[in-house]
Amino acid sequence: MSRLTHELRRAKWELRVAGRRTAKRRFRRRPDMPTLFGCAMAKSGSHALSQLLEGLAAITDLIYTDMHPIRTRLPQIGARSSEEVLRDLGRLRRGDIGWGYLPAIPTYLDALADPRWYVLFLSRDPRDKLISEIHYALRMHPKHGFREHLLSLPTMEERISASISGVPGIIKGIAGIYESYQGWLSHPRTRVVRFEDLILERGRALTTLVEDLGRAGVQTHVPQAEALRSLDAAMSPSKSPTFRSARPGGWRAEFTARNVMEFKQATGDLLQRWGYETDKDWAL
């Protein structure tokens, strides 16, 4: 994507959102309506997050402004400045829904600390995310920066090892990736939703979210039971063009005992900090 293409798409976005705001009588709504921002890591269930946000727009006065995420890097352009990313965030008004892949650096943490923001962060088991990234690079993204290196490795065990440790100049190790997002877990405006809960405990997870949004000033148009049915129907991970498997714990079929040892050595207490294990004694 060229920078000109990106700017043209942005101009179309402004026109589209203006129409949606008018259609929902945007300026007659309560001034305490939050701005909802969904945040995730790549290959951590972000399509499920997008479906959830779209479902919320259907049952509330929130406006899903753009299905395209806010990114810190763009294809064929490369890294974007934090100022460019902040401008994208600044276009979101109260009552808007946006989403993106934003690491937890002070610039973004501070920008979204304002009381008008409601940050919905989607987390996923690092082991499942790692496997998902490998299959995505090999099967679905011919231009993925990690693909050539993965293809040079003869076994899945070695590919997992490389993903755990990282490859200098190509990809971060899994610990570094999660460290760069960990600040969202303790951010004052953030509510964390686990991808696993959206798959295995969806009713409970959606109920908790809808009730919390209500306390934040976002009311549903319909009774809660109907709202929850609507949200449940909106979520179908298999409809994602990059879908492979939404089954939590699928890493167990791919890791070897060696990979488990390498993961523990490389990540320390990462799984405990993210709530995926209670201690370091986990195994296949």
PLM region spans:
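Short, flexible loop/turn segments with low-complexity composition
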Residues: 219-227, 275-284
